[in-house]
Amino acid sequence: MIHYIIDGNNLIGKDSFLNKLQRKEKQSSREKLVLILDRYFINKKANVTLHFDGYPNETIRSNKARVIYSENRTADEKIKYQIEHLKSNKNTTVVTSDNNLAQFAKVCGCKVVASEEFLKIIQDSKSGDDEEKRIKEISNQEILKLFKAK
């Protein structure tokens, strides 16, 4: 099973909507990111750890991700600590665009996906879902036409 370790603040910073939202309402941007990740990982066999800087304002519940706050350390330090203490890093993917953290993860044997690339993957998966829904709708409409024709 793949384990994703996600640099939450970095990911938020690379998404224009979440980045704008974070400037106004930090908690809301974090909640929205968790919702996006829950939807993306819903049918995937993966462990997800999402790291944020600072202390939690309110608890964020997630169906798929374990949310960790760095408290009096940086999220990068917590992520590095987690990577160092994993039994095996070969099935670990770190999502970040922080060069220092990405380099550390690579040296430790983790796969690294840039935040921008990960957002594109999520976006592409949403497009596929929309196309699938449209195909099903068209098929249902065609079936209804066939039954009405008789």
What kind of region is each of these model predictions?
Residues 2-5, 9-150:
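Nuclease catalytic cores that cleave nucleic-acid phosphodiester bonds
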